[in-house]
Each structure stands twice: as C-alpha cells, then as structure tokens.
C-alpha cells in the first residue's frame, strides 16, 4: 500500500473478505533511497493499526544511494512498535555495472544496520527470478522472504518463504484501483510469532547494590543541581 492507492476508506477495508477470509495484515511503503518518504505513509501506518490490521513497513531500495544512508534514513523516518512485522527491504533491481558480490554486500549492510536497531531479522521482498539470480547466497538464508510471483496457481520457489505476493491486480472494498494481494505461509498463530516482540523485562535480581546510577540511565545524586 502506498500513495498509488490514494485515500483509503478504512471503514470498508476493515470488513473486507478474500474468499470469505478476513484481511489480516497490510504492508505500507515508507521510504525510498535516502530522501523520499511516501506522502501517505504516516496516515496509512496509523490507520492500519487503528483499524485492527497487523502492519508492516517497507523501504524501497535505490541503487543510487549507499546502503548506510538508506538504512539510517529508514530508521529515522520509521518507528516500528512491538506487534508490527519486522522491517522490510524491497529490492527489485541490480545495477548492470556492479558485481553480484558487491551488490549482495550492499544489501547485507542495510539488513545488518536495521537488524541491530530492532533485534529481529528484516524481511526481504523481491520477485521470484531475482531471488534465484542474485540473492541465492547462503548469507541470506536466515532472512524471511516475501516473494512476488504472479500468474501461477502456487508458489514455485522451493526455498523457505513467509509471504507470497500472488497478484498485483487485486481488488478490495475501500481501495480504488488495483492492490497487491498476499498470502502468509502458515497459521495466524505462526504469523503472530513473526512480529516484533515486546522488550524483555529487566531482571531486577541482576542489579547489585553496587550498580551505579549512571548505568541505569538516571541522574546520580552527585550531578543534581
């Protein structure tokens, strides 16, 4: 979901069914490169959760900007919360003048920076043939995949995948025009286990009497005015 879907009628969308099955999750475009933010991102991000959908956010990869600049721009613009899907990197093309090894290293740089922030493996979105040709290196094996593969009755990719985007010409009440439709590979319970978890509680027993105030992130008495 992005600006291309225009203004969403969320009252209609939250009651939408696909083959008698409710729509459970929505992925929203946030950023592209190191300077573009989708004009509908903030409203779509808010409304998705407000209307009861599990939500995810994707960054559209640009080959014109460094991986580090893109990763830090995404992290500055997007504040995911517990209960959201892990961040998504949408990567669909490789420069002709770049080696596959260099391209893969750039993608891994983005993934590692974002993973360090959220402590979850980002999702890689790409299409079937691109995955086979450019992202088959074993360094990507631990990342969850969201594969676009249209005009087939079932996913032909034989590796592990989490989400299948099976059409780019879906129709849903509340959305004008076409929208991509996706299927999660597992149960609703399985899908919930994939979401960003709540932070682990602090183990107070691990804090000794000698622990300094500074290490707890509060102001120590000696610095008080």
Question: Across the structure, where does each feature detected by a protein language model lie?
Answer:
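Functionally critical loop-and-helix segments that line ligand-binding/catalytic clefts
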Residues: 1-5, 11, 136, 140-225
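Short, solvent-exposed loop/turn segments at secondary-structure junctions
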Residues: 95-97, 130-133
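Aromatic-lined carbohydrate-recognition surfaces of secreted/lumenal glycan-active proteins
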Residues: 119-132
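Short beta-strand/turn micro-motifs composed of small residues
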Residues: 59, 126, 149
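Proline-rich low-complexity regions
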Residues: 86-87, 122, 148, 155
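Substrate-binding cleft of extracellular glycoside hydrolase catalytic domains
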Residues: 1-111, 115-120
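Flexible, glycine-rich phosphate/dinucleotide-binding loops
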Residues: 35, 64, 131, 154, ...
């Amino acid at each position: 979901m992005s600006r291309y879907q225009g203004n969403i009628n969320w009252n209609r969308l939250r009651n939408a069914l696909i083959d008698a099955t409710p729509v459970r999750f929505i992925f929203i475009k946030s950023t592209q490169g190191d300077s573009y933010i989708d004009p509908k991102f903030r409203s779509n991000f808010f409304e998705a959760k407000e209307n009861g959908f599990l939500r995810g956010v994707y960054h559209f990869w640009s080959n014109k900007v460094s991986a580090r600049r893109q990763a830090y721009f995404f992290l500055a613009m997007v504040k995911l919360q517990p209960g959201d899907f892990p961040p998504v990197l949408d990567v669909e093309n490789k420069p002709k003048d770049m080696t596959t090894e260099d391209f893969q290293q750039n993608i891994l740089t983005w993934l590692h920076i974002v993973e360090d922030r959220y402590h979850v493996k980002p999702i890689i979105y790409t299409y079937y043939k691109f995955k086979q040709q450019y992202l088959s290196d074993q360094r990507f094996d631990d990342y969850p995949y969201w594969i676009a593969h249209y005009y087939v009755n079932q996913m032909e990719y034989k590796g592990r995948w989490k989400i299948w985007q099976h059409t780019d010409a879906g129709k849903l009440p509340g959305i004008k025009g076409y929208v991509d439709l996706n299927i999660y590979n597992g149960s609703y319970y399985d899908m919930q286990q994939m979401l960003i978890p709540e932070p682990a509680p602090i183990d107070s027993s691990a804090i000794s009497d000698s622990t300094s105030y500074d290490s707890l992130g509060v102001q120590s008495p000696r610095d008080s005015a």
